[in-house]
């Protein structure tokens, strides 16, 4: 059984290498644009589609769909959901378990349900490499 699922596939566009881990779902009822260097952790759901709010319209099968853009070098943490109409800015990190229902600017760490900016990513976040000689 495949560990990746999508609605159509032809609406998913990658700009370069992107790593999509196992158990990810992309509901591509509108275009999903994924930048280069993107890391998508296990269990992420990228959902362009939604349902009507009013129950009478849902009963008629009326739904919604909005495109999603994930810019270059984004990391989306495990079991997060990205909702339709959202853009995640270049270099940003989405914390595990987040629900992204609004745009996220570039170069930030954002977490939560709903997802909110925690802080900017700075040079202090660079991994310190030590060499033992």
Each language-model region and where it sits:
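Flexible, glycine/small-residue-enriched loop-and-beta-strand segment within the central core
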Residues: 2-87, 113-115, 119-131
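A generic "structured core" feature
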Residues: 33, 71, 93-95, 99
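Extended beta-solenoid/beta-helix repeat architectures
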Residues: 87-89, 104
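Acidic, glycine-centered active-site loop in nucleotide-sugar glycosyltransferases
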Residues: 105-106, 111-114
């Amino acid at each position: 059984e495949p560990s990746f699922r999508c609605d159509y596939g032809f609406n998913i566009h990658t700009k370069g290498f992107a790593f999509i881990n196992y158990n990810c779902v992309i509901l591509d009822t509108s275009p999903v644009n994924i930048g280069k260097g993107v890391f998508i952790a296990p269990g992420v759901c990228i959902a362009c589609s939604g349902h009507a709010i009013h129950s009478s319209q849902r009963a008629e099968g009326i739904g919604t769909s909005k495109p999603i853009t994930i810019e270059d070098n984004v990391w989306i943490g495990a079991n997060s959901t990205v909702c339709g109409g959202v853009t995640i800015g270049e270099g940003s990190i989405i914390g595990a378990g987040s629900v992204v229902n609004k745009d996220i600017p570039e170069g930030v760490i954002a977490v939560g349900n709903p997802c909110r900016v925690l802080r900017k990513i700075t040079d202090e976040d660079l991994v310190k490499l030590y060499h033992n000689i």
